[in-house]
């Protein structure tokens, strides 16, 4: 039985960064700041919500941008193949109100994410994180119920789950993060990442004898 779960980040790994796309659509360059630049997600989100309020923008405007976002070329095929050989969970600090349309385009994989607090007029008034330090906490919880995790992401907030997993990889990350973490293998293409994940799965697959005695 496959006791592995592959845990992937969403933005920057499978789909373009939502906030960068919205910054370009709305003409507000400050919103291009992401977790690649700011490790403190709580601080980053409060700052983003302040900018949205200042410009009178809400959930509707962001969702209109998200509707036009397509997965990174090759992402859906990568995910389809990966899900055919092992279990996959997307662990993201994004929000369910943002992720829904993107999950449809990716074939409805399982995603663990957070939720926005939205007023009746569409203003985003706050956000609710599922748990603190959600990516790290989630992989540790999976490990506590008998799973081995393999993790990959591109940003500061992915490092916890990558380092806590039996195998972890940077994917499409920044030069600075790669330089700061030379111990982590870093890949740029889905083929490279797939090969790395497959080598981990192969290494931990039970032998036929193990299966016959289980």
Which functions belong to the PLM regions below?
Residues 97-149, 180:
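Substrate-recognition "cap/lid" segment bordering the active-site pocket of phosphatases
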Residues 84-85, 145, 164, 180, ...:
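Structured helix-beta-strand junction loops
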Residues 203-214:
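Single conserved hydrophobic/aromatic residue that forms the stacking wall/gate
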Residues 80, 140, 159-160:
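Alpha-helical segments flanking ligand/cofactor-binding loops in enzyme cores
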Residues 115-118, 173-177, 191-193:
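Short, acidic/turn-prone active-site loops that include or flank metal/cofactor-
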Residues 96-100, 158-159, 194:
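Short, well-ordered alpha-helical microsegments
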Residues 92-93, 148-186:
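Acidic, Mg2+-coordinating phosphoryl-transfer loop and its flanking beta/alpha structural elements
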């Amino acid at each position: 039985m496959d006791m592995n779960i592959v845990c992937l980040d969403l933005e920057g790994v499978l789909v373009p960064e939502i906030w960068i796309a919205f910054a370009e659509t709305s003409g507000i360059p400050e919103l291009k700041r992401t977790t690649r630049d700011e490790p403190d997600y709580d601080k980053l989100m409060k700052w983003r919500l302040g900018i949205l309020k200042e410009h009178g923008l809400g959930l509707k405007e962001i969702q209109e941008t998200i509707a036009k976002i397509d997965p990174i070329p090759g992402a859906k095929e990568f995910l389809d193949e990966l899900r055919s050989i092992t279990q996959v969970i997307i662990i993201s600090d994004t929000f369910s109100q943002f992720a829904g349309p993107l999950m449809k385009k990716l074939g409805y994989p399982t995603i663990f994410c957070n939720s926005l607090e939205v007023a009746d007029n569409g203003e985003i008034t706050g956000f609710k994180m599922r748990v603190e330090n959600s990516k790290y906490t989630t992989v540790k919880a999976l490990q506590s119920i008998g799973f081995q995790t393999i993790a990959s992401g591109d940003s500061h907030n992915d490092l916890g789950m990558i380092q806590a997993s039996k195998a972890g990889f940077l994917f499409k990350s920044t030069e600075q993060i790669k330089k700061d973490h030379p111990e982590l293998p870093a890949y740029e293409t889905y083929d490279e990442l797939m090969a790395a994940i497959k080598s981990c799965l192969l290494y931990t697959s039970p032998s036929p004898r193990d299966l016959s005695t289980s």
